[in-house]
Design a protein with these regions (language model features):
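Sec-dependent signal peptide recognition
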Residues: 1-4
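Cytosolic catalytic domains that perform sulfur/thiol-centered chemistry
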Residues: 7-287
Length: 287
């Protein structure tokens, strides 16, 4: 309890409903060696050149299986083995970070919550803020002892393509698109067969909730206005999609941060990689 209260202090000043979902750099610098804290570096590159002390590296690709339709999730057994190898137990406080404002870290947050582990936070500002403040780094590779980790029923949900089809133009579900305008317009295909967007989806670019310089999250009032202006109500069921589930996870994390009911948040994890490569999925090409 003392640990949670301490890490909440900085985030509380920004007005977040769930300040425990973020830790700041000052807090982390004081808790690098805490026995029950596991720091996870999710940057695609750079870990070997230097990282936050005590951080273990996780390949973000390991938490999505592109061949596992319709959910695209690693199996419970695969996820248990992955967390165990990182030294994460069911009581571990996980702190995730990357160099892109949480785009990779948020996907770990989402899948941990999906598999029943809610004791996870993002480092606000991530590697960008940590490095800018010239905080300690090293290139040592920790070797944590494997610890038992068991999945259980979580809060957030995964949506399948069939469920998304059913949600098109539905009054019971808000469908958000976390991708760039170029992707939505169908001009930026990113190796996908077809471009465009899902009918009735609302553009909600993931990075618009971040400070453009520090990559830290904007205050709660600004984030709430961002989603309110998109027509997202506090009690709405929300499904978010992007290309491979990362940017969608970031939108979901941000909604959770400002107090949205986690049981009403879903990630279409097949994402545009599935939707745009299928021939039976309806696609719009103009907003």
């Amino acid at each position: 309890m003392a640990l949670l209260l301490a890490l909440m202090l900085g985030a509380q000043s920004a007005g977040y409903t769930r300040p425990e979902l973020l830790v700041d750099t000052a807090w982390l610098a004081q808790h690098l060696t805490d026995a029950n804290v596991r720091i996870v570096d999710l940057r695609p590159r750079g870990y070997g050149d230097g990282h936050i002390p005590e951080a273990v590296w996780l390949d973000n690709n390991a938490i999505r299986n592109a061949k596992a339709a319709p959910t695209f999730l690693p199996t419970p057994q695969e996820f248990e083995a992955l967390m165990s190898k990182l030294g994460i137990s069911n009581t571990t406080r996980v702190i995730a970070y990357d160099e892109r404002g949480g785009i990779y870290a948020a996907r770990l947050w989402w899948i941990l919550n999906y598999y029943g582990h809610s004791n996870v936070a993002l480092l606000d500002g991530g590697w960008v803020k940590w490095a800018a403040e010239q905080r300690a780094t090293n290139n040592a590779t920790p070797a944590p002892a494997a610890t038992p980790f068991k999945v259980k029923a979580g809060t957030v949900k995964v949506a399948t393509a069939d469920q998304v089809k059913a949600a098109i133009n539905s009054s019971s579900m808000k469908l958000l698109d976390a991708r760039t305008q170029g992707e939505i317009d169908g001009k930026d295909l990113r190796n996908i067969k077809r471009g465009g967007f899902i009918e009735s989806s609302i553009p909600a670019y993931w990075e618009d909730t971040l400070d453009p310089v520090t990559k830290a999250f904007k205050p709660a009032a600004e984030i709430a206005k961002f989603y309110r202006d998109k027509g997202v109500g506090a009690n709405d069921n929300v499904t978010v999609y992007c290309q491979v589930g990362m940017r969608a996870s970031h939108d979901l994390f941000t909604l959770a941060l400002i107090g949205h009911d986690l049981t009403k948040l879903a990630n279409y994890y097949g994402a545009w990689e599935e939707w745009g490569n299928r021939d039976d999925t309806p696609i719009k090409t103009k907003q």
